[in-house]
Amino acid sequence: MTSPALNFITFNQDHSCLAVGTSKGFRIYHTDPFSRIFSSDDGNIAIIEMLFSTSLVALILSPRHLIIQNTKRASTICELTFPSAVLAVRLNRKRLAVVLEEEIYLYDISNMSLLHTIATSPNPSAICALSPSSENCFIAYPLPKPREDPDANRPAHAPPQSTFVAPTSGEVLIFDTLSLKAVNVIEAHRSPLCCICLNNEGTLLATASETGTIIRVFSVPKGKKLYQFRRGTYPSTIYSMSFNLSSTLLCVSSTSDTIHIFRLGAPPGNTTPAGAPIESPASQRQDRWSRARSYDDSESPGASAADSPKNEPAELNGPGAGNNQGGHTRGSGSFSSMLRRSSQIMGRGVAGVMGSYLPQSVTEMWEPLRDFAYIKIPKSAAASGASRTLRDAPGGPLRSVVAMSSSSPQVMVVTSDGGFYVYNIDMEHGGEGYLVKQFSVNHSVLEGDDKSDASGYGS
């Protein structure tokens, strides 16, 4: 029997559940222990969103039609029809946000009354984040751009009388869904936005541009830049970002097969002028697992393309070097690799000292910010049909979704072929996480190191 195509995969707000929309209904799973708790075989589900661990789910079966359903009572609470296709749905205990390509509809979730309609620039990727918090109830989305701008870089092939619409901006608008007022605009990137997310308390915003080499974290609603991380050397499309519930870690997945985990937080006063924590000797020891980082800050709002070199070569132990396909090694033991790591530690130490004397736009070039830990996800050996379905889904491109467990230092990864993977992270030393459990959301249990949760699967 052929498994239904996967259309949509998402974690709920506290990462305790996983919802999967398929061509033949939808399923909901507990993440720890991993077990199926609800399933429905009705409809071709393009989008599904949960409200924490309640029985309320939002479903998109046809492009313009939203259904709010109570799974416990098997009843429909309400149905809404929109003027164009629904690209995303966001929920918290106060608000429901429905994202269309050029509008966002805000509803009071207690009575489903329409509160406000936000006009946006064309946003086909549905870049939008709603805080899970009922107090800091902010929604973030790309700052709308004027539809007609005489200074816009109109393509040469555009018809003379046409209206050129600029691509999504690199600025984020923060909107308070309780007061229904815009509260701030954050200049996050010079390149168009690709992915944004808010933490559980609605106090932190993570952003990534289409370039995908730099991840930034800002305070909300003030918009102060707190952290700047480097994901890698080469451009990559960011698919998913997620804070853990305590907002001390940020997970990022992309087109590469590496999940990056960045550490947030530093002792008071132990920061660089740009707000990035200075590394301790313990974190410097992680160099043996680090890869080269791009020093291209051209997407930074405060930097120009001439500020830094763009062709920084990768380290010899980086991806694609020799026979090391994983890209992360625990040191080759050679004299040259030892010398290189020593030079990196010394160079980064000098960068931290020099940063205190240089302007912010210059110190950002020196910041030795990198992932605290990382994960190598398995490459799918299955046919790419499921992947194509997920990429073509109204929710936008989706190859992998990540979240941190709420009860342990573990990272959960769901891939577009239906694999569900759980990795342990060493919270003291970081480095490479190791696989401890693996299951499938396609009705079969994958081989793995831990079969303890398999009995609950499919029940």
Swiss-Prot record:
Out of the domains of life, which is the source? Eukaryota
Enumerate composition-biased segments (Basic and acidic residues): 285-296
Q: Does the keyword Protein transport apply?
A: yes
Query: WD repeats: which residues?
Result: 1-39, 188-228, 233-272, 393-433
Q: Which UniProt keywords apply?
A: Autophagy, Endosome, Membrane, Protein transport, Repeat, Transport, Vacuole, WD repeat
The record's section on InterPro entries has:
PROPPIN, WD40/YVTN_repeat-like_dom_sf, WD40_repeat_dom_sf, WD40_rpt
Spell out the subunit comment: Component of the PI(3,5)P2 regulatory complex. Interacts with ATG2 and ATG9. The ATG2-ATG18 complex is essential for autophagosome formation.
Biological role? Component of the PI(3,5)P2 regulatory complex that regulates both the synthesis and turnover of phosphatidylinositol 3,5-bisphosphate (PtdIns(3,5)P2). Plays an important role in osmotically-induced vacuole fragmentation. Required for cytoplasm to vacuole transport (Cvt) vesicle formation, pexophagy and starvation-induced autophagy. Involved in correct ATG9 trafficking to the pre-autophagosomal structure. With ATG2, protects ATG8 from ATG4-mediated cleavage. Autophagy is required for proper vegetative growth, asexual/sexual reproduction, and full virulence.
Could you tell me what this protein is called?
A: Autophagy-related protein 18
Organism encoding this protein: Gibberella zeae (strain ATCC MYA-4620 / CBS 123657 / FGSC 9075 / NRRL 31084 / PH-1)
